[in-house]
């Protein structure tokens, strides 16, 4: 009888040497994971500017994630918060993405980490945010 070897792809999240960042080895994205990600409520523009100027140790070139990127953090087996294990600073509410709603740049998609759902919010609303960059 031949033995079959099955590999199950797992999302590997590991903490890097730098404080306040997490590496998603599946997507090669470096995520900010700091108290501000849980505590701060800001407008879209404020979140965008914060990420633009963020530097954590050797990591810079941060930005707001696309909706697709942010949804890679959703774990539908978890609830309140519906996020992958490994993140310390999370609020079970909506987070900004850089994905504009249709052609209206006054509204952007958000991801809600209570259940993992998506919704559109006007840019003047205050929401949470999490910065990201591609691993180089």
Please describe what each predicted stretch is.
Residues 4-13:
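Sec-dependent N-terminal signal peptides
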Residues 18-62, 110, 131-132:
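Extracellular adhesion/carbohydrate-recognition regions
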Residues 19, 93, 126-128:
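Short hydrophobic/aromatic beta-strand or adjacent loop that forms the aromatic wall/cage
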Residues 48-61, 67-112:
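An exposed tryptophan-centered "aromatic clamp" motif
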Residues 115-120:
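Short, P/G- and charge-enriched loop/turn segments at secondary-structure junctions
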Residues 121-136:
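Short, structured beta-strand segments at or near domain termini in extracellular proteins/domains
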């Amino acid at each position: 009888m031949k033995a079959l070897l099955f590999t199950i792809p797992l999302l590997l999240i590991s903490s890097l040497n730098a404080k306040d960042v997490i590496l998603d080895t599946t997507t090669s994205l470096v995520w900010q994971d700091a108290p501000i990600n849980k505590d701060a409520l800001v407008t879209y523009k404020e979140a965008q500017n914060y990420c633009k100027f963020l530097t954590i140790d050797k990591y810079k070139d941060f930005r707001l994630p696309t909706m697709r990127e942010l949804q890679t953090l959703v774990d539908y087996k978890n609830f309140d918060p519906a996020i992958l294990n490994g993140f310390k600073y999370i609020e079970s509410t909506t987070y900004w993405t850089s994905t504009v709603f249709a052609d209206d740049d006054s509204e952007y998609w958000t991801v809600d980490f209570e259940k993992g759902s998506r919704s559109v919010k006007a840019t003047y609303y205050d929401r949470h945010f999490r910065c990201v960059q591609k691993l180089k």
